[in-house]
């Protein structure tokens, strides 16, 4: 299957550069995956599309302020580090810029010197293994010194770091936000509960690979990045019960979707307490085992994410919906508007 089949024209002005003042002020396009029918709505009205007994599954990961700007201890030369993955304890895999300034043994100092990192290994493509030294609690030091690693298509600075976190974020470890969840407020979640909709959480730590374009010509040749996920025993039991009672399982975002499909795929369509790494790649032809619908944002042309939603709703339906979104000037990507596929 050609990657070009998932291309569409997107004016740059429709790429949202900043979040809206109110999280739930975003627009909502509803796509009937069976008929292809489109409805223009607003996120504040999303409750009306849910039924009592449905279950909403959210990803409670929290984004690390993983961009650190420091100086080499010996020369004072500027260095940027991007935290990619925690190895063990205070050892992290990072991306260094400019990489040539960071050799094995290089010490980088951040802020007022209360955070230091020493390079223990040089990797390819600018990767560096670093061991951190600090006083206090690492994540608190990081919160005060680090910046959010915003996607490459966002050029504006973020005034409030919390706007790149969901209101229910809890488990620290992502390099990017699960952006479909950014629209939710505490009020909307409460209104859904009041209607009899069950709210459940999984964790998937989003990697920077989520922004990596599909460089292959053929969809099947693309290699997905691996991301860590986990589901508790309580959540697994709750989801199995929803399924038994005939309720719908609606995932929030591609990250929740990939987690649920990974787990159901490994347990004959059932949910079980699990943790591990998933590199599941969902594209047209995939048979869904876990979800009945999903809430998502509008994705990049030719990305693995537009392929995932095309698997759920059909490629032609998705491209028609996206063309409608362009005509109606919906906002695209991380800080953009939302789509509900049911």
UniProtKB/Swiss-Prot annotation:
Keyword field contains Transferase: yes
Catalytic activity, EC: 2.4.99.17
One Pfam family hit: Queuosine_synth
Keyword S-adenosyl-L-methionine tagged: yes
Catalytic activity: 7-aminomethyl-7-carbaguanosine(34) in tRNA + S-adenosyl-L-methionine = epoxyqueuosine(34) in tRNA + adenine + L-methionine + 2 H(+)
Subunit structure: Monomer.
UniProt xrefs under PANTHER family: S-ADENOSYLMETHIONINE:TRNA RIBOSYLTRANSFERASE-ISOMERASE
Family: Belongs to the QueA family.
Protein name: S-adenosylmethionine:tRNA ribosyltransferase-isomerase
Protein species of origin: Bacillus subtilis (strain 168)
Gene that encodes the chain: queA
């Amino acid at each position: 299957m050609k990657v070009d089949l998932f291309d569409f024209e997107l004016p740059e002005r429709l790429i949202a550069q900043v979040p809206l003042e109110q999280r739930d002020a975003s627009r909502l396009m509803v796509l009937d995956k069976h008929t292809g029918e489109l409805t223009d709505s607003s996120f504040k009205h999303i409750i009306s599309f849910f039924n009592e007994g449905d279950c909403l599954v959210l990803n409670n990961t929290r984004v690390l302020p993983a961009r650190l700007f420091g100086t080499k201890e010996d020369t004072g030369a500027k260095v940027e580090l991007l935290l990619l993955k925690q190895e063990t304890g205070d050892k992290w895999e990072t991306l260094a810029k400019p990489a040539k300034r960071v050799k094995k043994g290089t010490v980088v100092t951040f802020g007022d010197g209360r955070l230091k990192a020493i390079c223990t290994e040089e990797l390819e493509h600018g990767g560096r293994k670093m061991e951190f030294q600090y006083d206090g609690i690492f994540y608190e030091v990081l919160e005060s010194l680090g910046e959010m690693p915003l996607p490459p298509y966002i050029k504006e600075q973020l005034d409030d770091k919390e706007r790149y976190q969901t209101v229910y974020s809890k488990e620290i470890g992502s390099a990017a936000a699960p952006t479909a969840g950014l629209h939710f407020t505490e009020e909307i979640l409460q209104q859904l509960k009041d209607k009899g909709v069950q709210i459940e959480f999984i964790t998937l730590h989003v990697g920077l690979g989520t922004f990596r374009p599909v460089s292959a010509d053929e969809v099947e040749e693309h290699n997905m990045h691996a991301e860590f996920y986990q589901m508790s025993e309580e959540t697994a039991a709750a989801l199995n019960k929803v399924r038994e009672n005939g309720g719908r399982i609606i995932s929030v975002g591609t990250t929740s979707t990939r987690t649920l499909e990974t787990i159901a795929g490994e347990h004959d369509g059932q949910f079980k307490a699990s943790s591990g790494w998933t590199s599941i790649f969902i594209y047209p032809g995939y048979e869904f085992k876990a979800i009945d619908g999903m809430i998502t944002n509008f994705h990049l042309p030719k990305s693995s994410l537009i392929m995932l939603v095309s698997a759920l709703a059909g490629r032609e339906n998705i491209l028609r919906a996206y063309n409608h979104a362009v005509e109606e000037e919906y906002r695209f990507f991380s800080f953009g508007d939302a789509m509900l596929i049911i």
